[in-house]
């Protein structure tokens, strides 16, 4: 009898514990901050005021789960690319920004598989644009993208891979 009560208690606790994870909702545990910063950065982004949008986007990225909105990750790639262009003369900072850009692409692939092919193709283009000074790393990245996208790989990515390998 005690074993049955114990088993029922454990099962009830397990169910209650797992329900908290799904109860967070689309915008995560701090949904008000998430929605607020999504709204703020989006307004600046629509106006192409990327300098003003970037700090608000960073806050949205901090408070929102990657699954809250696809545009948060895709807009983030545009904002980071803009920042990379402005910091061409600072190689250390540029390298960190490129790493952040690749992280955003990986999150897009992981959390939004519907858009994985286009995300991977865009990732390969940005790899080619920003990693030319690291040919081994570039070749490895391009090869990885081609292996994942297979027949849906953009033709120019094959050319980039060949030119990098030579």
Q: What does each model-identified segment do?
A:
Residues 27-28, 61, 106-109, 113, ...:
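A conserved position within tetratricopeptide repeats
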Residues 1-30, 77:
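Bacterial Sec-dependent N-terminal signal peptides
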Residues 40, 76, 80-83, 123-127, ...:
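Structural register within alpha-helical repeat arrays
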Residues 48, 131-133:
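Residue-level detector of the short coil/turn that links helix A to helix B
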Residues 133, 140, 151-166:
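Non-catalytic protein-protein interaction scaffold segments in large eukaryotic complex-forming proteins
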Residues 21-99, 114-118:
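N-terminal leader/linker segments that initiate helical-solenoid repeat arrays
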Residues 70, 119, 154-158:
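TPR alpha-solenoid repeat register
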Residues 56-59, 89-109, 134-149:
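Alpha-helical repeat scaffolds
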């Amino acid at each position: 009898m005690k074993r049955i009560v114990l088993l029922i208690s454990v099962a009830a606790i397990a169910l209650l514990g797992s329900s908290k994870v799904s109860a967070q909702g689309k915008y995560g545990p701090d949904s008000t901050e998430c929605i607020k910063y999504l709204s703020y950065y989006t307004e600046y982004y629509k106006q192409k005021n990327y300098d003003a949008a970037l700090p608000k986007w960073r806050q949205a990225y901090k408070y929102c789960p990657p699954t809250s909105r696809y545009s948060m990750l895709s807009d983030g790639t545009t904002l980071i690319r803009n920042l990379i262009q402005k910091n061409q003369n600072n190689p250390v900072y540029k390298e960190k920004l490129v790493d952040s850009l690749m992280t955003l692409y990986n999150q897009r692939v992981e959390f939004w598989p519907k858009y994985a092919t286009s995300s991977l193709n865009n990732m390969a283009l940005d790899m080619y644009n920003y990693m030319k000074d690291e040919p081994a790393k570039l070749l490895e990245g391009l090869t990885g993208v081609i292996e994942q996208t297979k027949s849906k790989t953009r033709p120019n990515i094959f050319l980039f891979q060949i030119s990098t390998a030579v």
